[in-house]
Curated annotation (Swiss-Prot):
Disulfide bonds join 18-68, 22-43, 29-50, 33-52. It comes from the Eukaryota. This is Antimicrobial peptide MeuNaTxbeta-4. Expressed by the venom gland. InterPro entries: LCN-type_CS_alpha_beta_dom (IPR044062), Scorpion_toxin-like (IPR003614), Scorpion_toxin-like_sf (IPR036574), Scorpion_toxinL (IPR018218), Scorpion_toxinL/defensin (IPR002061). Residues 1-5 form the signal peptide. It comes from Mesobuthus eupeus. The keyword tRNA processing does not apply. Belongs to the long (4 C-C) scorpion toxin superfamily. Sodium channel inhibitor family.
Amino acid sequence: LIGVKTEHGYLLDKYTGCKVWCVINNESCNGECKRRGGYYGYCYFWKLACFCQGARKSELWHYETNKCNGRM
C-alpha cells in the first residue's frame, strides 16, 4: 500500500498562478476540490478563494511559490 500525503489549502489556478477565486459558491469549490483529489472544498469568503481539504500539495497555492504577481 502506497500512501499519498494530502494537505489543506487554497486551490491553485495553474494557468494564472493565483488562488481559484469565488464569491459565495460552496458547490463550485467543493466540486473543484473533489476533481483535484480532495474530499471537501468551500468558498472562504474573507479571502474570496476556494479552500480545499485533502488535496495533493501540487494542487494547492503556496505563498512561498506564489506566481500570481499580486493579483489575488
